[in-house]
Amino acid sequence: MTLRTINAKDAASLDRDLMNEGGFSLDQLMELAGLSVSQAVYRVHPPSKGRNVLVACGPGNNGGDGLVAARHLAHYGYKPTVYYPKQGKNELYERLKTQLHNLSVPFTSDFLGSLQTSDLVIDAIFGFSFSGPLRDPFPKVISLMEETQVPVLSVDAPSSWDIEAGPPKEGPGAKFMPQTLISLTAAKPLVKWFKGRHFLGGRFLTKGVVERYGLDIPEYPGVEQIVEVDVNGEGKL
């Protein structure tokens, strides 16, 4: 069975529906997304594999998901370090940073140096709303994630990938294939290029929303906020 996906326009519409008629706030959606990311990390990279996690955050909501995930990981016993070179304007991001500071989670401006001592990288730079071109410092950061032997988990999309067309034909990200991808709420069309472990996160959709957008939402086991889903991606770059 081919996994049904949702394009960028419908993903944005779905978020608006959740916050309008659904009654969710942005804070809630970001908290649920970040919790899902943290559970995916625990599933593929338990603390026994290494506790040093580098969380690369972009300026938008994808970066906010990364900040939330870092907080949860700190409570799980990991040692997250956050790379957050360009903070978004929403005051929510400042509050998320305060929560991390209160847990003594370090922030770094040296991505390469932190990468060299990390056991896992969370790519929370760009999500479903990304459109190029890449701006500094992110081309270099994406190239480093592309080249590293450290496993990478991408949030909603491997950064630099187009939501519809997948990886760029050339430049940073053209050969970027993270080991793990967690799609938030629903998978995006880019999953057909992905080859790795794929999770779905975001256990809060109503039956009406699922039917309206024609989504495939598998059953979540127990109290889990994530479910592993095979995308049968070609994975050829």
UniProtKB/Swiss-Prot annotation:
Organism (species): Ajellomyces capsulatus (strain G186AR / H82 / ATCC MYA-2454 / RMSCC 2432) (Darling's disease fungus)
Top-rank taxon: Eukaryota
Protein name (database record): NAD(P)H-hydrate epimerase
SUPFAM superfamilies: YjeF N-terminal domain-like
PROSITE patterns attached to this UniProt entry: YJEF_N
Residue ranges constituting the YjeF N-terminal domain according to the UniProt record: 11-223
GO cellular component: mitochondrion
Cofactor: K(+)
EC class (word): isomerase
Cited InterPro entries: YjeF_N_dom, YjeF_N_dom_sf, YJEFN_prot_NAXE-like
Gene Ontology molecular-function annotations: metal ion binding; NAD(P)HX epimerase activity; nucleotide binding
